[in-house]
């Protein structure tokens, strides 16, 4: 079937923001800056956690995995989108398009469960501090990490294989910023009803269930925070929880709106904005909220910087 598809459509055209030629220059600069900050920032987090033995505990190892996911997620989408913004019309091969779709689903699926696992880790640390070592032991941590990545691989493999089996024999213009499943599915010359049922069920399980678990975890955390004797401590904890919830709500909210109904009635421009929310803004917010606001991460960064300065002076 795939050979037949490729004989009809050998490449796709990504339209991106071609309807707004006067804004493409500004969008290119803005997206490039955000992409570079996300790329460099997450790379630094990966290096810091990998080199500092004191950070080899579940909380920071979760952050390391989140940085790997966010860096990879951005790298899959952003370069192609920047090319789209810098040219009038850009093409992507049939195989290249589905390769991009696969990795978007892989890293997106992994992040969905990983954020839930991180919320559970914080819940265990704050609400059950005496039993935390037993609750979040090495075995539990490894199972959560392995399951997160396995979920991403499974989602990417099943969904990409299914969509690529559809015939594509008509228009080859994808009115989107990347080869995401809903945008590509609109070009399929076949009945996709069964796939849409699968997409709805899969999205509910992979996106909405972890999100609900995160909300429940943070509700328990907030009750624990209210019992804190220190007003300053409560304010700091509330600020951190609010920042975390803002990031996860943006990610899960826009992703569910996109994937619950692959052929939804949203306008193409609305779909592009929603895609930017979880592919461009969320990785940046995760970097700022989960890592750079963390005091231990700042300490490790300064330690690494001082070591670098000392080595240069020798």
UniProtKB/Swiss-Prot annotation:
Disulfide bonds listed in the record: 97-189
Membrane spanning residue stretches: 26-46, 55-75, 100-120, 140-160, 198-217, 238-258, 272-292
Listed GO CC annotations: plasma membrane
Positions in the Cytoplasmic compartment: 47-54, 121-139, 218-237, 293-314
GO biological process: detection of chemical stimulus involved in sensory perception of smell
Top-level taxon of the source organism: Eukaryota
GO molecular function (one): G protein-coupled receptor activity
Major localization listed first in the record, in broad terms: membrane
Extracellular side: 1-25, 76-99, 161-197, 259-271
Protein's cellular compartments: Cell membrane
Name the record gives this protein: Olfactory receptor 10A6
Organism: Homo sapiens (Human)
